[in-house]
Amino acid sequence: GLLEALKKRNYEVKAGARFMRGDKICNFDFSKKFTEGWDWTWQVPRADFDKALTDELETWGVNIDFEKEVVGVDFNGSDSITTIKDVDGSLSAISAKFIVDSSGHGRVLPRLLDLDKPSDIGRHSSIFTHVKDTKRPQGREGTIITFDIVSLETWLWVIPFSNGYTSIGFVGPSDYIESFQGSHTEKLQEMMKLSEYYFDRFEGLEYEFEPVIIKNIAKSVKKLYGEGFVLTGNSAEFLDPVFSSGVTFATESSLVASKLIAKQLAGETVDWENEYAEYMKEGVNVFATYVKEWYTGNLQTIFFDSNDNPTIKAQICAVLAGYVWDKENPFVKNHHRLVKTVARIAEMEKEADKSIG
């Protein structure tokens, strides 16, 4: 498959993640998780990663058009004609038996077919850029992906890449991020002062591009499929960057959808509602619980204030690693209830420790 081409890029290995809040630290090691599976992934600069994939696919004979915009789609049953606009404004058309929308934040079909609907995740926005990480420490400290929580709903990500650059960005309530004055660069420079731990490391470094702001990052849709099309990855649902759930849904939805499309084009009957939509919603609902409970503070309580129970930590680690369909995991099967319950126990233990102290 594509794995060998990606291995040649020597991306930074992500074997876990670190969460910080003040002087408290919670480390997750993907090799110590409840569900069997991969113990690592990569920390990748997305542009390079995507280009590595498209370059490899072109060697397989896949036609990929760059610098084109989809401006219209007309369906006749499951057949469709897609209108494409070139950089010079000229139009062309593509006929297809089936469309897979993997356009991410571009959300092509949701926009054209009026499929967008409000997400029930809170209104958060992100602001981010890349820097040449010239003050990067040696060893694990310099390479570990870290989430620095500066307040209940606002946190900084630090994602080091193997090419010497690092992605830095904040997520927080939309109105809070909008409250910072000036250009996008000035906004992010001011926000970096919120991180006592990382401020010195990134102070004075030039941003590789004007920081990008994505407003109200959580997205949802009225339906995940229709006659002749399917939505995959972020073009369907996007919750929040905090647990890399977008990567999980992108890979899983694309894999499931591709198998179902192959069946359908071979003349077999496919139950898109149960085999795709309901299946994907199961995973979305699990991750949505963890995102919501992150911002209520319950999950943060488990991370930073609970007695370190290795069984519970392994079960939560499996969720963070993307294994959100494993019903053997109590933190998947009982996700609605269990996070609240364990957080409450942690708070009681904390109060008990205070009274003893």
Give a label for each model feature:
Residues 25-44, 81, 171-175:
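Helix-loop-beta segment of a Rossmann-like dinucleotide-binding subdomain
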Residues 34-56, 177-183:
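Short beta-strand to alpha-helix junction loop
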